[in-house]
Amino acid sequence: MRGAKSVIDLHAIAHNYNVAKQMMLQKNPSGHVLAIVKANAYGHGAVQVARFLLKHCSSIDGFGVSSIEEALELRHGGIYNKIVLLEGFFTEEDELKLIDDYNFSIIIHSEDQVNSFIKYPFNRPVEIWLKLDSGMNRLGFTPSQFMKFYNLLSNNKNVSNIGKITHFAFADMLENPEHTLKQWDIFEKSVAHLPGPLSAGGSAIILGWLNTVCTDWLRAGIMLYGISPFLSKNKDSKTPESVNIKPAMKLVSTIISVKHVDKGQPIGYGGRYVATRDMKLGVVAMGYGDGFPRQVKDGCPVLVNGVKAPIVGRVSMDMLTVDLSDIPDVKPGDEVIFWGTPELTVADIAKYCSDTSPYELVTKLTRRVPLQYTY
């Protein structure tokens, strides 16, 4: 069997949810935290993660997903708790029927959604979250539009409860607080006087802004998986260890060949890297076909038998090469770790790629990389 796999520590995810919940409750004793499991739980397996959280956490307030397909996967997997569709619905009749049948909560962010929603003959009222665009300029109603649609929905029989929700564009940049503070001010002034729950922000708010921004519901996304939302270049960055979250994914594979090359020999496609000395190379069963980034630079570290070794040469579809010259006794079958340890995190790997992030790296792993769970 090919050695590439993603080892998922479910206990770490449960620990991280509990960290988020405790931080929330310290600021708001009646507060709630939505566990975000969109994009297959950021590549960690949505159904397995949701089931484990429900079994091993004392109180799970609900789950957030992107689409109706993701929500149905949870329901069909036996998850009967609150599920919020973070992008609302995309088509009218088909999705609204499923929302009704499966009792999903939805975000509403456009006039078209409002018009479709109020016309549909629901069998029971639906919990909705009306989204305010407080300055991200993505989804949501502007402050000048918001009250029109709030009033329209608050008097509609299809609505059981209206929450108010927004999202922040710069919350992961602690050295640049002005934009987040401005968005928070707009959100408060626009909706805080209205009845019903408020939700503002995700992992960056939970870990970095609760002294300023605290609402009734927060959304724990990337932090659930042990990854800090804060950009490593920030002077005030918070590492996973400093905020007491544990990495949940360890990406591993194996050495499939060990060979020697002479100084001056090109390595890999295009000969991007040329051996600077007589070298011992390891060929590893991991490539961009598995989701490992093709754009990774030479020198990006991996762990071979617990020792750091640099990637040299271009990443191929199925393989990559590492310099084993300083590591003795490496043989085919030996383990290679790409990320998921205190010594080597997914954020470390992102630094060696152009214009990517830990979010992208963990969600881009392909089905060629099976998930192996530790319970």
Swiss-Prot record:
Metabolic or biological pathway: Amino-acid biosynthesis; D-alanine biosynthesis; D-alanine from L-alanine: step 1/1
Alphabetized GO MF terms: alanine racemase activity; pyridoxal phosphate binding; serine racemase activity
Keywords on record: Isomerase, Pyridoxal phosphate
Cofactor(s) this protein cannot do without: pyridoxal 5'-phosphate
Residues found modified as N6-(pyridoxal phosphate)lysine: K38
Positions annotated as active site in the UniProt record: K38, Y269
Domain of life: Eukaryota
The protein's name: Alanine racemase, catabolic
